[in-house]
Amino acid sequence: MGKTTTIGSVELERYVQSAFRLQSGDTVVYVDPHRLDGGPPAALILITHEHFDHMDPNAIAAVATDDTVIVANAACARQLQGKVKGRVVSVQEGDTVTEKGVEVRAVAGYNGHHPRGFNVGFVFRLGDQMVFHAGDTDRVPEMSQFGEIDVALLPIGGTYTMAEAEAAEAVRMIRPRVVIPMHYGYATGGDPEKFASLVGPDATVVIL
């Protein structure tokens, strides 16, 4: 079990690394599920890229049903097709799909460890919240073009992603109401309290 918070009509639960469950009403969305052994059945699973701590077939199997839709980039989709329950939908940066009543837009997310196209972020509306999950990325210029974001889920761990200071600069580009740090304290460092102090009044930081 992870730590939970509720923002508007959406309950968010953060597990390890960048793994989240988001639920509004009966619609359950997981993003990058990792090291899960169960949970509410998924309507939708979003996978940002194929690294083991983001695309975990065992965790997907723990929450997927035959009715689940899995949205992932092409490399992940190829690996998952026919190996997990549910229907797999392949996307690339710039694509928008609507599945299970949720409109999902694949957006830019990249750095030296994750070349452009290897990782995608996801912007999606669930309930009354517009959510952005960055996957593994640094601050990139495209972030200023994502439109209105209520809740941003941003990596802060450094090494493979942006660290606290760069993530705080990303907050100023994205302009979310709420930001939840992720991708820290597992395979990398990262201090969520330091990140919160750097964000200051620019957004409400919720640490899970």
Could you tell me what each predicted segment is?
Residues 46-47, 105-107, 154, 181:
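Redox-cofactor binding/interface segments in oxidoreductases and associated redox assembly factors
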